[in-house]
Amino acid sequence: MWNFLAPPAHKQELPAEKIDSAYKSYRWQVFLGIFIGYAGFYIVRKNFSMAIPELAQFGFEKGELSIVLSMNAVAYALSKFLMGSVSDRSNARVFLPLGLVLAAVSMMFMIGPVQFFGPEQKSLAIIVMAVLNFLVGWFNGMGWPPCGRVMTHWFSVTERGTMMSIWNCAHNVGGALVGPMAVYGALWFGSWFYGADASRYFLIGTYVFPAAVAILVALVAYCLIRDTPQSCGLPTIEKYRNDYPKNYSEKQEEVLTAKEIFFKHVFNNKMLWYIAIANAFVYMVRYGCLDWAPTFLKEAQGYDIKQAGWAYFAYEFAAIPGTLVCGWLSDKVFKGGRAM
């Protein structure tokens, strides 16, 4: 059943004179694929935050909507942990686009609770919204793991910090587009679906338009991404760049079982736990601001939805310079010692 996710077999290595040009071409192609693909996930991740101010006008209370909002975060955390082990044993070229398409389809269905139930059946609408937003979060959890897999196979340890920092800007690019998409998606396409009923235009801008774009992004990502260098007839990145991490062995190129991943490399990795705990507090601040920013800006500051959308855009883009500097420092100053 899951054979379509299996990593592709290693091909016979190309002639030596073709390896350098092929490697350079594939590396940029693959990097572009995971950058665009990961940005696509953020086009269909936190859209519900943009919808909250409009949903409140339909009679939904913020306490109820906060439950729906939290389902996304819970599902995302669980999925990154569980689906990450599946990703480690899957073809990144298939796994990433599949997750993005499923997230986009789930996002499209988010119009259903308002369209078919509305405030008249508020409890049912909240339950359906919560389930759908849980699915959006779950499928979004399929985005980071294949990108991490691709990055470690195509970029060596001493360049990985810089490349990771550039790639990590993808989530800021994708997240920044949510606000403008909500505004212009409603403006351009809202009347196609709802005629003169402008109160529902936000459903198209917030859910349907970004989801349609994300599906197109998934197709582009599939065309660009390749799983490993060996599947393209190339040597490992360590051999190609003569850049071996400490304690490197050819055995590290093997596909591990879920048991080996969890019990040898996750549960007993103290540094991983330190980073996870620290990151949890960072995300409390980050998403505490991000999730409620559109509502706060509209209700407390008097912003209209267009102004709130562009403020959302600015918040995400402001993170890009710091991300790039940190990645460069981890390579050039700390020599690949990310934990430092």
List where the protein language model places each region:
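Residue-level signature of mid-helix packing/kink "hotspots" within the transmembrane helices
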Residues: 46, 73-81, 141, 175-176, ...
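Extracytoplasmic gate region of multi-pass secondary transporters
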Residues: 48-52, 267-324
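Cytoplasmic membrane-interface "Motif A"-like loop-to-helix N-cap segments
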Residues: 89-100, 332-340
